[in-house]
């Protein structure tokens, strides 16, 4: 009997420890690179704005936790997650096999293709058409992997930048012939700005290195946070909040694939 009581006591202690170890989030820290309008950027007053920002704040509201945004260059997102600088990454991060080896992801936030951006009339459409030209990309993105694996081998001079704003500076100054980047960001952000008035995008690039699904990046093995974020994302769809935010930024365009 004494042995049985000890066993039960040990079980109770283990259960209590399990409850205590379950983290109760009162605040969620999201890493963001605010150089990617209309998904994430800064307003004139310095506040963060964009589709991702609104989604992140809405997820926090659904989960009844405080949102804290931590700015970082995109290349520092995964190292930042591993170093616990933030709990998740909401910054147009595409889900790729390579990234899935390093971190986990929530369910889908949205999907979007990749394209080239260049001066109107240049007509770039393939790696071959860019031979001898210079193309910029943001470090740490799926476009970097494509540039190194495909464009470099096609005789294209590629250059990495810490953020998308720096890419645009060199593109508009003539130091770059084109950029390779998220198509929606280009069409709905850069091309609608005064600086992008004389530019256009190519058709979407069809390549296995350029998947389209984006999600919230999470530290590897944090299944509890993944379940919490998935719950918040589902709630946004169920109560119509996602549709409202999407319409605010993109009108009738649907970015959600449901995959």
Each model region followed by its residue ranges:
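Short helices/loops that flank or line small-molecule/ion binding pockets
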Residues: 58-62, 70-71, 75-87, 102-104, ...
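Extracytoplasmic small-molecule ligand-binding "clamshell" domains
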Residues: 22-92, 239
């Amino acid at each position: 009997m004494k042995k049985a009581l000890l066993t039960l006591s040990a079980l109770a202690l283990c259960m209590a420890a399990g409850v205590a170890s379950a983290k109760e989030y009162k605040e969620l820290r999201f890493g963001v690179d605010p150089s990617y309008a209309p998904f994430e950027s800064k307003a004139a007053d310095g506040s963060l704005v964009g589709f991702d920002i609104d989604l992140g704040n809405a997820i926090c509201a659904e989960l009844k936790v405080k949102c804290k945004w931590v700015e970082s260059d995109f290349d520092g997102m995964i190292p930042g997650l591993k170093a616990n600088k933030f709990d998740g990454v909401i910054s147009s991060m595409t889900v790729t096999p390579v990234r899935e080896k390093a971190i986990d992801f929530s369910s889908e936030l949205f999907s979007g293709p990749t394209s080239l951006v260049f001066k109107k009339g240049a007509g770039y459409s393939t790696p071959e058409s860019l031979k001898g030209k210079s193309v910029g990309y943001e470090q740490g993105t799926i476009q970097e992997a494509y540039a190194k694996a495909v464009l470099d081998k096609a005789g294209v001079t590629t250059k990495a930048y810490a953020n998308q704003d720096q890419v645009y500076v060199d593109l508009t100054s003539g130091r770059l012939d084109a950029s390779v980047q998220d198509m929606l960001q280009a069409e709905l952000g850069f091309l609608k700005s005064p600086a992008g008035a004389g530019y256009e995008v190519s058709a979407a690039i069809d390549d296995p290195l350029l998947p389209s699904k984006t999600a919230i990046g999470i530290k590897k093995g944090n299944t509890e946070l993944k379940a919490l974020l998935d719950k918040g994302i589902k709630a946004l769809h169920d109560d119509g909040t996602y549709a409202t935010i999407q319409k605010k930024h993109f009108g009738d365009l649907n970015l959600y694939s449901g995959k």
